[in-house]
């Protein structure tokens, strides 16, 4: 992937950029793998906002991605196309399996049209192949990692993300997460070789607020700019500092978002470094 910069023909275009989509080989998705997708605008079933700063955006169709590839062990597949997916930052790859079935996967870096993909413990260690952690050599960079055997890929699915297998210890494999945390995961869990492609996506300059609205992202308003009825930091005569330590709109102190006493904490070997004093 590359990034194409715009010339400053308008204030909104000045400094903005866009992906060049050079790796995309087809513009229309596979119809059998597309589902309708309705928008919630960040509201729950009662109409209350439960996820702020969401709403609007271009209409999308959902592409069904295969995050559980266990049932295709030993069935080779060919990469038919690399496609754009509006629902995620990564590109997706359309696989044609030897038994006639078609499926989408998240496209890893360096995967090309025409490549051969394998699943199962006997698969080669090459980008796009999916196999259990216990069959992957130590030091390998992986993505789309399961947290429970058969539970489907949960970790490292966005553009440019990856996890490194740093050690194996009995029934567990030790993984270095994107946050720097080292965690034990059941060695029977599956992972895909390589890192997720489209890594330069994070370098795109969106240029103007309107492009974020096309993506369905609404403005983020500071608490000190609100009225007292709307936020604990609101109100005051003129500009103020908020008058207290930073809190959420509901009065919860900022930071410390990890739940204490979580059962899976015992699997953490080394915690992520946050840079904050505890």
Swiss-Prot record:
<dbReference type="Pfam" id="PF00181">
    <property type="entry name" value="Ribosomal_L2"/>
</dbReference>
<keyword id="KW-0687">Ribonucleoprotein</keyword>
<dbReference type="InterPro" id="IPR022669">
    <property type="entry name" value="Ribosomal_uL2_C"/>
</dbReference>
<feature type="region of interest" description="Disordered">
    <location>
        <begin position="210"/>
        <end position="278"/>
    </location>
</feature>
<comment type="similarity">
    <text>Belongs to the universal ribosomal protein uL2 family.</text>
</comment>
<feature type="region of interest" description="Disordered">
    <location>
        <begin position="1"/>
        <end position="58"/>
    </location>
</feature>
<dbReference type="InterPro" id="IPR012340">
    <property type="entry name" value="NA-bd_OB-fold"/>
</dbReference>
<keyword id="KW-0694">RNA-binding</keyword>
<comment type="subunit">
    <text>Part of the 50S ribosomal subunit. Forms a bridge to the 30S subunit in the 70S ribosome.</text>
</comment>
<keyword id="KW-0699">rRNA-binding</keyword>
<dbReference type="InterPro" id="IPR022671">
    <property type="entry name" value="Ribosomal_uL2_CS"/>
</dbReference>
<dbReference type="InterPro" id="IPR005880">
    <property type="entry name" value="Ribosomal_uL2_bac/org-type"/>
</dbReference>
<dbReference type="GO" id="GO:0019843">
    <property type="term" value="F:rRNA binding"/>
</dbReference>
<protein>
    <recommendedName>
        <fullName>Large ribosomal subunit protein uL2</fullName>
    </recommendedName>
</protein>
<dbReference type="InterPro" id="IPR022666">
    <property type="entry name" value="Ribosomal_uL2_RNA-bd_dom"/>
</dbReference>
<dbReference type="InterPro" id="IPR014726">
    <property type="entry name" value="Ribosomal_uL2_dom3"/>
</dbReference>
<dbReference type="GO" id="GO:0003735">
    <property type="term" value="F:structural constituent of ribosome"/>
</dbReference>
<feature type="compositionally biased region" description="Basic residues">
    <location>
        <begin position="210"/>
        <end position="220"/>
    </location>
</feature>
<keyword id="KW-0689">Ribosomal protein</keyword>
<dbReference type="InterPro" id="IPR014722">
    <property type="entry name" value="Rib_uL2_dom2"/>
</dbReference>
<dbReference type="GO" id="GO:0016740">
    <property type="term" value="F:transferase activity"/>
</dbReference>
<feature type="compositionally biased region" description="Basic residues">
    <location>
        <begin position="269"/>
        <end position="278"/>
    </location>
</feature>
<feature type="compositionally biased region" description="Low complexity">
    <location>
        <begin position="40"/>
        <end position="49"/>
    </location>
</feature>
<dbReference type="InterPro" id="IPR008991">
    <property type="entry name" value="Translation_prot_SH3-like_sf"/>
</dbReference>
<dbReference type="GO" id="GO:0002181">
    <property type="term" value="P:cytoplasmic translation"/>
</dbReference>
<dbReference type="Pfam" id="PF03947">
    <property type="entry name" value="Ribosomal_L2_C"/>
</dbReference>
<feature type="compositionally biased region" description="Basic and acidic residues">
    <location>
        <begin position="23"/>
        <end position="33"/>
    </location>
</feature>
<dbReference type="GO" id="GO:0015934">
    <property type="term" value="C:large ribosomal subunit"/>
</dbReference>
<dbReference type="InterPro" id="IPR002171">
    <property type="entry name" value="Ribosomal_uL2"/>
</dbReference>
<comment type="function">
    <text>One of the primary rRNA binding proteins. Required for association of the 30S and 50S subunits to form the 70S ribosome, for tRNA binding and peptide bond formation. It has been suggested to have peptidyltransferase activity; this is somewhat controversial. Makes several contacts with the 16S rRNA in the 70S ribosome.</text>
</comment>
């Amino acid at each position: 992937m590359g990034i194409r910069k715009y010339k400053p023909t308008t204030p909104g275009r000045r400094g903005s950029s866009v992906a060049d989509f050079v790796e995309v080989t087809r513009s229309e998705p596979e119809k059998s793998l597309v589902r309708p997708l309705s928008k919630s605008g960040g509201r729950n079933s009662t109409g209350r906002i439960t996820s702020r700063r969401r709403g609007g955006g271009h209409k999308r169709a959902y592409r069904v991605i295969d995050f559980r590839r266990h049932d295709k062990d030993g069935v080779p597949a060919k990469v038919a196309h690399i496609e754009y997916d509006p629902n995620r930052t990564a590109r997706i790859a359309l696989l044609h399996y030897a038994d006639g079935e078609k499926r989408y996967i998240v496209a890893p870096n360096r995967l090309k049209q025409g490549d051969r993909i394998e699943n199962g413990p006997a698969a080669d260690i090459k980008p796009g192949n999916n196999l259990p952690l216990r069959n992957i050599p130590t030091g390998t960079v992986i993505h789309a990692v399961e947290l429970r055997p058969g539970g489907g890929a949960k970790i490292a699915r966005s553009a440019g993300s990856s996890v490194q297998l740093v050690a194996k210890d009995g029934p567990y494999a030790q993984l270095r997460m994107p946050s720097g945390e080292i965690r034990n995961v059941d060695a029977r869990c599956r992972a895909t070789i390589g890192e997720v492609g489209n890594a330069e996506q994070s370098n795109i300059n969106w240029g103007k607020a309107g492009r974020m609205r096309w993506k369905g992202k609404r403005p983020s308003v500071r608490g000190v700019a609100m009225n007292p009825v709307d936020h604990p930091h609101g109100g005051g005569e003129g500009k103020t500092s908020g008058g207290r330590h930073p809190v959420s709109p509901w009065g919860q102190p900022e930071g410390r978002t990890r739940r204490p006493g979580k059962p899976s904490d015992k699997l953490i070997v080394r915690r992520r470094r946050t840079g904050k004093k505890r």
